[in-house]
From Swiss-Prot:
One protein family per Pfam: AUX_IAA
Subcellular locations according to the entry: Nucleus
One BP annotation, GO: pollen development
GO annotations of cellular component type: nucleus
Subunit architecture: Homodimers and heterodimers.
Name assigned to this protein: Auxin-responsive protein IAA32
Length: 191
């Protein structure tokens, strides 16, 4: 303990009585080392003398951007503004329950969900799926490449399994229900 600390520093606070014990001889404090929290000293200035927030009114009055403006900026950056506006209403809530689609990799028990509104094309979808599942394979997924051992298939709302990339992106996003990353030799088998 700091020798400059007054001996009655811990006397006034009842919250330290279980962690510190005073001796009868010297009136000093023995640290029992039982505290798991840090000691927070009182403020040096009383509340009446606190420093004002003059000049910081602009920061305090600054409003957070709305969800719609963020969605619009995001969709303008990726080039799929119309698609993003179709999935969100004015309150920012998802209108379509198919904005998030579950993706499973053969051999893994747990699947993951992907937001198709955040993707602008098949290439960005393949990159995100490679980031999610690529570490589970020796050579990565390499989806949509001829030398890949994996194929990406999807089930549409009618329950028919199809190859991803056979239809235009917008039609794919509107009809997809679930996706599966299958080994190429397994992709030929009926589901």
């Amino acid at each position: 303990m700091d020798p400059n600390t007054p001996a009655d520093f811990f006397k006034g606070s009842s919250k330290f009585h279980t962690y510190y014990s005073q001796t009868k001889k010297g009136g000093g404090v023995i640290d029992l080392g039982l505290s798991l929290r840090t000691i927070q000293h009182e403020t040096y200035l009383p509340p009446a003398r606190m420093i004002g927030l003059d000049g910081y009114g602009e920061l305090i009055d600054w409003s957070q951007p709305s969800y719609n403006s963020i969605t619009q900026l995001k969709s303008e950056d990726t080039g799929h503004q119309r698609l993003a506006q179709g999935y969100y209403n004015n309150e920012g809530e998802s209108r379509g329950k198919y904005a998030y689609v579950k993706v499973n990799l053969d051999g893994l028990v747990v699947g993951r969900k992907v937001c198709l509104v955040d993707q602008g094309a098949y290439a960005t979808l393949a990159l995100q799926l490679n980031d999610m599942f690529g570490m589970q394979t020796v050579s990565g997924l390499r989806l949509f490449q001829t030398e890949s051992e994996f194929s990406l298939v999807y089930r549409d709302r009618e329950g028919i399994w199809r190859n991803v990339g056979d239809v235009p992106w917008k039609e794919f996003v509107e009809s997809v229900d679930r996706m599966r990353i299958a080994r190429r030799n397994d992709a030929l088998l009926p589901f």
